[in-house]
Curated annotation (Swiss-Prot):
UniProt protein name: Large ribosomal subunit protein uL23
Keyword line: Ribonucleoprotein, Ribosomal protein, RNA-binding, rRNA-binding
Species in which this protein is naturally found: Desulfitobacterium hafniense (strain Y51)
Quaternary structure (record): Part of the 50S ribosomal subunit. Contacts protein L29, and trigger factor when it is bound to the ribosome.
Gene Ontology CC terms, in alphabetical order: ribonucleoprotein complex; ribosome
Keyword Ribonucleoprotein: yes
UniProt-recorded Gene Ontology molecular function terms: rRNA binding; structural constituent of ribosome
Family affiliation: Belongs to the universal ribosomal protein uL23 family.
Biological role stated in the UniProt entry: One of the early assembly proteins it binds 23S rRNA. One of the proteins that surrounds the polypeptide exit tunnel on the outside of the ribosome. Forms the main docking site for trigger factor binding to the ribosome.
Gene Ontology biological-process entries: translation
Family annotation (Gene3D superfamilies): 3.30.70.330
Length: 95
């Protein structure tokens, strides 16, 4: 197993992800090679909570253009983690 800091990159802060916190669901950008088992273990280790469910989404990079040059942003992976009832992640409390 990889280190938890290598699996979880940063939390997703958006209007939709902040709304999911009320349902005890937290969103993170994760490593594109990470699987659900590694994501679950990383969240449980870093935040000392019990994970009930992990859902992942592969987000394709967007096409970007500067003048005549066309490029792409990097592909990313997002994980939505559902915690056991009563568990909370403290860093998200103020959102």
């Amino acid at each position: 197993m990889r280190d938890a800091r290598d699996v979880l990159k940063r939390p997703v802060i958006s209007e939709k992800s902040v709304g999911l916190i009320e349902e005890n669901k937290y969103s993170f950008w994760v490593d594109t090679a990470a699987n659900k088992i590694e994501i679950k273990a990383a969240v449980e280790k870093m935040f000392k909570v019990k994970v009930v469910d992990v859902r992942t989404i592969n987000v394709d990079g967007k096409k970007k253009r500067v003048g005549k040059h066309v490029g792409r942003t990097a592909d990313r992976k997002k994980a939505i983690v559902t915690l056991k009832a009563g568990d909370r992640i403290e860093g998200f409390a103020g959102l």
